[in-house]
Amino acid sequence: MDKDNQALDELPMMTGSKHANKRLFAAFMIFGLLNNVLYVIILSAALDLVSADTPKGVVALFNIFPALITKVVWPLLSNGKIRYTRRVGFCTICSWFGIITIALSSSLSPRLLGISLASLSSGMGELTFLQLTTTLPTEATSKTALGAWSSGTGFAGVAGAGIWWLLRGLGVKGGLGLSSFLPLFFPITYKYILPPFSHLEASSDSSPYQRLPTSSSLSNNNNFRPPAILISVPSSEYVPQHTPLLSSGFIDRDRDRNRDGEELTDGDKRLMGMRASRLTTQEKMKLLRPLVVRYMLPLCAVYVEEYVINSGVAPTLVFPLPTYGLWSWLFKSPRDYYPFWSLTYQTFVFLSRSSLSLGLPPIPKRLLPLPAIIQFLVLSLLFLQAKTFFFSSPAYTPPADGDGGVDRSITIVFLLICLEGLCGGSGYVNTFYHVGREGSSVSENYDADGENEMGGDRRTLNVTEMEKKAMEREFRIGAVGAADSTGILFASLISMPLEIALCRSQVDQGRTMCREL
């Protein structure tokens, strides 16, 4: 009978937990979509933002470089507790002001300033929300949040191109003016959709993060003795047993509230002041070094390869128009090829970035370089097609332009670009999944006898060390976030001369379609 009553008591908690998980997924999906959609809209609007004699690569450069600087520099310079609420507010204001500046300006310089502000917001947003996934109370909820974020960023590619396609008829002022309302959903989602973290804990049977005792647990258990908290210099005394311990659990998104959204008590703030942890520059460098080869180089390589394909090779993948079959319905003009390759790529990036959300297992850590290896193969084959028409039949190899029918290489290129999108999305979501798990288990910091490297016992793990471990997780995922932007920047420098060289090669062989677009 008691078991039945206990089951009935737990039923509302389980139902509430499932609802909280849905809110968590929706919130991070929206965060990912909002953070990347303006980036895509700006790239899609590049032709309308600059004059005909201005290289379109200027827009791409100003759209990525500020984000890269933010993601490289900020994790190294910032210190102490991350104030997530303030960061979300900064991203909202910066993104809105940037897009409004672009919309209301008619000359190049202020538009580039607006693009830079939007890029700065995008870089800070990715850094912030990836770090936020490491603060969730369980491994399962962190995985849910990361999967939703990745799905949102993947869908932003399709959504951004579609939004600008619908709004471009309104012009830059009207189309981007309407788009400026999108950043306002950041604070709305953060405040009203993202659930209190305490509602998420019943959703998982195990948690890699140790929860601090709450005031309610202390008051309801007279025999409970809170763990002694060792305070370093200037005092080596234990904190008295009656010292308040974070009255409602984990510290949430800034230092003034806990994860239930309640104001911290004066005792909580005093305790936080005594145990404030910071990562020194030396500690950050020590954390960063193993990440470079393990995570950053493979992710950077994937991004270099896929953006070289998108910006340097894909514009030259143009074929004689097919006269029958499915391709003849899609390609009515040579200008239709590049948008179709872009849509294909974005669609399969979205699918692969959603792999965790779809319940697919992550690839093992040792196989993280695999997407970059496959991507290099895809790049090589597409380069050969653009350079030598490697897959084309003799009837479609220049100087011949075919005599009706369909060039078989169109289908092969389509399949290769599908694989490109799958590799790019897989590299992103799996890299950040494994980075988020680095250092997530407190037990991994102890030897077989239960002692850590500082000589402490697992049973007396102090609050300062726990907070420092959390900061290390936030730093790791934030630092690795610079790898993708670095790859895009390198790719942009490679792509511009590569596209020119490939087009010149095609013209020399007798096919001038790339020049006529």
Swiss-Prot record:
Primary location recorded for the protein, binned into one broad class: membrane
Signal peptide extent: none
Pfam families attached to this UniProt entry: CLN3 (PF02487)
Compartment(s) of residence: Vacuole membrane
One GO term describing the cellular component: cell tip
Keywords, sorted A to Z: Amino-acid transport, Membrane, Transmembrane, Transmembrane helix, Transport, Vacuole
Bilayer disposition of the protein: Multi-pass membrane protein
Transmembrane segments: 24-44, 57-77, 88-108, 112-132, 146-166, 169-189, 371-391, 409-429
Biological processes per GO annotation: amino acid transport; regulation of intracellular pH
InterPro entries given in the database record: Battenin_disease_Cln3 (IPR003492), MFS_trans_sf (IPR036259)
Role noted for this protein: Involved in vacuolar transport and vacuole pH homeostasis. Also required for cytokinesis.
PANTHER family in UniProt: BATTENIN
Family: Belongs to the battenin family.
Name recorded for this polypeptide: Protein BTN1
Species for this entry: Cryptococcus neoformans var. neoformans serotype D (strain B-3501A) (Filobasidiella neoformans)
Species lineage: Eukaryota, Fungi, Dikarya, Basidiomycota, Agaricomycotina
Record gene name: BTN1
